[in-house]
Amino acid sequence: MNHLTGLFGLPASTLVELLDLATGYREGLNREPETFAPLLSNRRIALVFFENSTRTRFSFELAARHLGAGTLSFTAASSSVSKGETLSDTIRNLEAMKVDAFVLRHPSSGAAEFVASITKRPVINAGDGTHEHPTQALLDLLTLREYFGKIEGLKIMILGDILHSRVARSNIIGLKTLGAEIAVCAPTTLLPGRIDQLGVRVFTGIDEALAWADAAIVLRLQLERATGGYIPSLEEYSASYGLTDEKLDRLKRLMPVLHPGPINREIEISNLVADRIQPPGYSSSMLMEQVTNGVAVRMAVLHRLLAK
C-alpha cells in the first residue's frame, strides 16, 4: 500500500492489519503518560485541507506528533490558492520542500487519487467530495470491533443523507469487505439510485431499520438539504428520521450509536442519544470512543505508509 486514497480495492487482510495496529496504539493512548516510539522522527507531513475540519485535522496532527513527526498545516484561505494557484502546483511546491507525505481534504471527488498520480510521496485521503473518507470508516470499524469483538456477521444500519456522504460510501466498502451486513435508511430523495446493487438493504422507515440492526451509524444532515428540495423541512426530517430515545426505547435492547460529527443536535440525533454512554436506556453513544479511535487509526495509517 503506497497511498490510502480509499478503501475500495483493499483486501480484508490490509484492513485487519490496520485495525490490529490501531488497537495497539489505542491501548497506548489509554496509558498515562502516553509514550510511543518515535518511528517517524525527522518526517514532515503536510496537512493540506481545502475544507474545514476539527476532528480529522487535529487527530492527524496528534497522530503525527505521537510518532515523532512534524506537521505543516495548510488552509486554502491563507495560501496561494487564494491567488489562483492550482492544486497540482501546490502539491509540487510542497514536494519540492521535501515533505514526506500529504494528508489531503478537498471538495472535489477524486482529488486524492489525482494527487497520488502526480507525487511520489504517500497520499492519505482525509475526505474528497462525495467519494471516500477512508480513515473515518477505519475508526468506525475499530469502534464496532472493540464493542462487539468482531465485524463479520454484524448488521450495521447507516441512517441519513446517504446520497451526499463520503462517510457512508467508505463504511459500506469497509464493512462489506470484513463480512458485515449493511442497510441504509433515508428518505428516497437522499438515497443514491440503484443503491441496492451495492448489496445493501434499503429501509425508508426507521423503526424497521432499527429492529433489523445491531448498531447504527448516524450521518450529519447538511442543513442546506432543507432548502434544496431533498426534504420537506428539518422538522419533518427530524420527526421521521431523527434518532431519539423514544425510537430506541421501542427496541427493548441496547443499541450502540456512532456519528462521524459534527452533530446537528435535535435534528439527526437527540441530545440524550448523543450523550448517553451507559444505561439506563437503550442507546450507548460511541461518539467519544470514535474520536479517540480516530487518533489511533491515523497513527496506524501513518505507521503503515511511512515507517521503514
Swiss-Prot record:
NCBIfam families on file: asp_carb_tr (TIGR00670), PRK00856.1 (NF002032)
GO cellular component, one term: cytosol
Quaternary structure (record): Heterododecamer (2C3:3R2) of six catalytic PyrB chains organized as two trimers (C3), and six regulatory PyrI chains organized as three dimers (R2).
Alphabetized GO MF terms: amino acid binding; aspartate carbamoyltransferase activity
Keyword annotations from UniProtKB, A to Z: Pyrimidine biosynthesis, Transferase
Protein name: Aspartate carbamoyltransferase catalytic subunit
Family named by the database record: Belongs to the aspartate/ornithine carbamoyltransferase superfamily. ATCase family.
Residues where carbamoyl phosphate binds: 55-56, 105, 133, 136, 261-262
Involved pathway(s): Pyrimidine metabolism; UMP biosynthesis via de novo pathway; (S)-dihydroorotate from bicarbonate: step 2/3
Enzyme class of the recorded protein, top EC level: transferase
Tagged with keyword Transport: no
Binding positions (L-aspartate): 83, 166, 220
Pfam families xref list: OTCace, OTCace_N
EC annotation from Swiss-Prot or TrEMBL: 2.1.3.2
Source organism of the structure: Chlorobaculum tepidum (strain ATCC 49652 / DSM 12025 / NBRC 103806 / TLS) (Chlorobium tepidum)
Gene name of the encoded protein: pyrB
UniProt key word Transmembrane helix: no
Reactions mediated catalytically: carbamoyl phosphate + L-aspartate = N-carbamoyl-L-aspartate + phosphate + H(+)
PROSITE patterns, sorted: CARBAMOYLTRANSFERASE
